[in-house]
A protein has these predicted regions:
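Phosphate-binding glycine-rich loop
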Residues: 96, 105-147, 161, 171, ...
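Conserved PLP cofactor-binding pocket of PLP-dependent enzymes
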Residues: 283-293, 336-341, 377-440
Length: 471
């Protein structure tokens, strides 16, 4: 069994593969109209030429790499929004010089617009996806002695946010969708469990129906982490709108981005008030009190400060207007690739909990195990097609500092109260998740891939797959 020193390479780069957090979003092709795909050889035909890894000519002369999605769509809309903030001389969200005769309005309007887009009542704009998680957990009342169940495969921020509140992270396995396994989730519930943190990982929704049913049955709160899935839906519902709260990241690797930022959404006024106070030094400002629309139910309390700036919100307002187009472009490319290779004998893709709701920024192909996966990746890279293991996150229970339960200070309440005193992490906490990570090959997609780029991906997979899968 590899230890996390090997697995942790997914945080920055798989050996020789340039895996970076710019691939944080995940693959799930959306349904699209049937398209004409490039000519291809018969499904069972051997490749016409040797693989590039074996000395043959590559499919492409240069490496095909997926670029950051949101910044590719920057134009005069973002520019004009930023100029408006500059000319108004009011970059802080609550007050300013108001040189154009109006108070700052980018943050408050983004919150209204994003809440409407996500079909929720409230939104709090914050500085990052991590601070969104921390604010949402505060709104849900999580603290020492509470347990929060989360998937073993996710980003470190999920674990970190739980620890920040002195609560105990409890890991559940993921399934072939790479999202939390509802059955294993239920097995991990104890009387101390307070919140289920379901992470819509790598651009694809978790299976929310059984998760919500478990939560209702066991009287638990559900926090949807949509950091890697802005623009994703589940059975017609935007992710983040089905649980008690949802969070999003607008970091540069995400669907839309001003460089960094985050948001919390909810339709529960108490969760909104708690998250709002937590992100703003315990205060409920007049602007948010007006949005709340009812008397405050909480007192001022000591907390951090994670307010978004007007500059960040300005870019996000312009990006939000383009979100549906970006998602449609992602899905178009991924659907065409999938259609072009789906007839290959025995090919298996990532399981989908919603065939049309994913972001569509990865194509994942299953293999027999790590050795075959690694050869598949090397072969595709030799053809100048970027390919990676499951990226953008980590198998948290085997991260060295998590397995050792390292904290900022000794005596951290997460591990001195209740089950936290005896809980053990490590590989035995997630064998199924490790197996899944060892099997999947990921091809990152770009919403602005050209027709030739799409054709090259199809050609490379069709060239490599029959050879590698026999090995």
């Amino acid at each position: 069994m590899e230890d996390q020193a090997k697995i942790e390479e997914t945080r920055q780069s798989a050996k020789g593969g340039g895996l970076t957090r710019r691939h944080l979003l995940a693959g799930a092709a959306g349904l699209a109209a049937v398209r004409i795909i490039p000519p291809r050889p018969a499904a069972h035909a051997a490749p016409a030429t040797p693989l590039a890894i074996d000395g043959g000519p590559p499919v492409r002369a240069t490496l095909l790499e997926a670029k950051l999605s949101g910044p590719q769509y920057y134009d005069d809309e973002e520019k004009n929004e930023l100029i408006d903030v500059l000319e108004n001389r009011s970059p802080f969200r609550w007050w300013g010089n108001n040189a154009k005769g109006h108070p700052p309005d980018k943050c408050i309007n983004f919150e209204k617009e994003f809440a409407a887009h996500q079909q929720t009542k409230y939104c709090v704009a914050v500085t990052s996806g991590t601070t969104a998680l921390m604010s949402a957990l505060a709104g849900l009342g999580v603290g020492p002695g509470d347990e929060v169940i989360l998937p073993a495969w996710t980003w470190y921020a999920c674990y970190d946010a739980i620890l920040a509140h002195g609560a105990l992270p409890v890991f559940a396995e993921v399934d072939e969708s790479m999202n939390i396994d509802p059955a294993d989730l239920e097995r991990n519930i104890t009387p101390a469990t307070k919140v289920i943190m379901t992470v819509h990982i790598l651009g694809a929704p978790a299976d929310m129906d059984p998760i919500l049913e478990i939560a209702r049955k066991r009287k638990l709160k559900v926090l949807e982490d949509c950091a890697q899935s802005v623009g994703v839906s589940y059975k017609g519902h935007p992710v983040g709108s089905m649980g008690d709260a949802g969070i999003y990241s607008f970091q540069v690797n995400k669907t839309i981005s001003p460089g960094e930022g985050g948001a919390v959404v909810t339709s529960d006024p108490l969760v909104f008030e708690g998250a709002t106070r937590y992100h703003d030094c315990g205060f409920l400002r007049d602007g948010h009190a007006k949005v709340l629309g009812q008397p405050a139910r909480m007192k001022v309390f000591a907390s951090p400060q994670f307010r978004m700036s007007e500059f960040t919100a300005a870019v996000l307002r312009a990006q939000l207007r383009k979100l549906d187009r970006i998602v449609a472009d992602f899905r178009d490319k991924t659907t065409r690739v999938t259609e072009g290779i789906q007839d290959l004998p025995g090919i298996q893709f990532r399981k989908k909990n919603d065939t049309g709701g994913g972001l569509g920024n990865w194509v994942f192909i299953n293999t027999s195990g790590k050795e075959q996966r690694d050869r598949f990746i090397k072969a595709l890279r030799a053809e100048n097609i970027t390919a990676e293991p499951m990226g953008g996150s980590a198998i948290l229970p085997i991260a060295t500092h998590i397995e050792k339960k390292e904290t900022l200070q000794p005596g951290w309440p997460s591990f001195t109260v209740g089950r936290g005193k005896t809980i053990e992490y490590g590989a035995k906490a997630c064998p199924k998740t490790i197996d899944i990570w060892n099997r999947y090959v990921g091809i990152p997609m770009d919403p602005k891939f050209t027709d030739q780029d799409v054709a090259d991906i199809i050609a490379a997979v069709r060239k490599v797959y029959p050879v590698v899968m026999k090995s």
